[in-house]
């Protein structure tokens, strides 16, 4: 049950953040605050999730990494939603395999697939926090996305 809640929480928190981001116009979406912009953070989240599935699925086509940088706001938010859904589904399945990590340090190393997926879930949560800070500095009402809030909402 814990991993199902974690997977559902990931979707819920991402949805709340994307809902607010979808209301921004192009200028606000690209406005720099605290050294970055909502666009740059969303691109980073999407690129990280693309990287996750690139390695898990053994992809060879790297063109997705260039395309992400050119996506307009709505397409970027939609891609984030698609990748969040894939990650949540993968976590629900509690995978048992290993994956070789080649993009972190010079020497590849193996980790459990579940740990690999959790890294991207935690990474996304970290950047959702950065988005919250930037959006609050833009005087927007930022939704709370704490795990306990999610549990309260589903109870």
Residue map of PLM features:
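Short, contiguous alpha-helical
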Residues: 4-19, 26-66, 105-155
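Solvent-exposed, charged/polar functional surfaces in cytosolic regulatory/catalytic domains
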Residues: 16, 20, 82, 86-90, ...
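A short coil-to-beta-strand element that immediately follows conserved catalytic motifs
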Residues: 94-101, 142-143
């Amino acid at each position: 049950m814990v991993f199902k809640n974690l997977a559902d929480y990931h979707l819920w928190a991402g949805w709340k953040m994307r809902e607010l981001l979808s209301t921004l116009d192009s200028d606000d979406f690209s406005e720099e605050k605290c050294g970055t912009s909502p666009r740059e953070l969303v691109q980073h989240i999407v690129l990280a999730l693309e990287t996750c599935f690139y390695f898990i699925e053994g992809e060879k086509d790297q063109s997705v990494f260039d395309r992400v940088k050119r996506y307009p706001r709505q397409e970027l938010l939609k891609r984030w939603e698609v990748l969040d859904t894939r990650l949540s589904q993968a976590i629900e399945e509690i995978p048992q395999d290993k994956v070789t990590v080649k993009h972190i340090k010079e020497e590849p190393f193996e980790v459990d697939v579940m740990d690999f997926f959790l890294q991207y879930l935690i990474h996304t949560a970290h950047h959702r926090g950065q988005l919250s800070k930037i959006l609050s500095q833009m005087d927007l009402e930022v939704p709370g996305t704490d795990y306990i809030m999610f549990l309260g909402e589903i109870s």
